Amino acid sequence: MSNTYQKRKASKEYGLYNQCKKLNDDELFRLLDDHNSLKRISSARVLQLRGGQDAVRLAIEFCSDKNYIRRDIGAFILGQIKICKKCEDNVFNILNNMALNDKSACVRATAIESTAQRCKKNPIYSPKIVEQSQITAFDKSTNVRRATAFAISVINDKATIPLLINLLKDPNGDVRNWAAFAININKYDNSDIRDCFVEMLQDKNEEVRIEAIIGLSYRKDKRVLSVLCDELKKNTVYDDIIEAAGELGDKTLLPVLDTMLYKFDDNEIITSAIDKLKRS
C-alpha cells in the first residue's frame, strides 16, 4: 500500500469522523449498516467515545447477528466503548467467544483486538488473553495471527514467549512485525529470541528488520553491529535506529554518528546516542 494511498485514506477517515461527531445517536446507528466501510468505522468510533447503554446494547446485539459485517462492527465497538463495571465480564466473555468460535476470520481478528483493548482498561483479563492466544496463534488466518500478536503485546506474561517465538517465524511479515514488537515492548529476553532476531536481520520486510535491529541493540548483542552500522550510513535513518546505536554500547559506532551530525538536522537524538556511547 503506497504512502499516498494511506494519506488519502487517513484524510477521508478524519473527515468522516468529524462529520459523524455532528450526528445524533440514531443517525450513527443507521450508519453502522452503511455500505461504505469507512462510514461504518467512523460512526462506530464516535459511538465508542460517547458510550451509553443504547450503544452498548446495540453492539451486543450485532455480535450475534447472522451478518458477519454486523458482528465485526459490534465487536469493534465493544473493544473501547465505556461500560459499567458490572457489564465488563459479560462483554469480555462475548468477545472471547467470538475470538475463538466465530466462523468469519475477519470477525475473529476484530474480536481478538477488542479483548486486548478491554484488557488494557482492566488487566484482570490478562490470563484469559494468554489462554485465548494459545489457540488463536495457530489460526489459519493471517489476520487472526496478526491480531493475536497485537493482543499479546498488551500483556506482560512470560508464558506467551513460546507463542511469540513461533509467530516470529510466521510466513507473513505483519505477523512477524507485531510478534517482534510484542517481545521488545515487554523486554522479553532469552537465547531463542536473540537467535530469531539475528535471522530476522535479513528479513525482506523492513519493519521486521528494524524491530530485530532494535531488539538486539537493546539486549547488547554485538551480532547486530555490522547491520546497524549499515543502517546508520543510509540516506534515510529512523530515530529508533539512532537510539539503538546508543543502547548497543559499541564505541566503534562513534565515527559514524559523528558524521551524521553534519548530515541530518535532528542533532539532539544523535548527540544523545553519542553521549550514551561515550559513557558505556
Swiss-Prot record:
GO terms for molecular function: oxidoreductase activity. InterPro entries: ARM-like (IPR011989), ARM-type_fold (IPR016024). GO terms for biological process: DNA damage response; response to antibiotic; response to radiation. NCBIfam families: PRK09687.1. PANTHER family: DEOXYHYPUSINE HYDROXYLASE, PBS LYASE HEAT-LIKE PROTEIN. This is Protein YibA. It comes from Escherichia coli (strain K12).
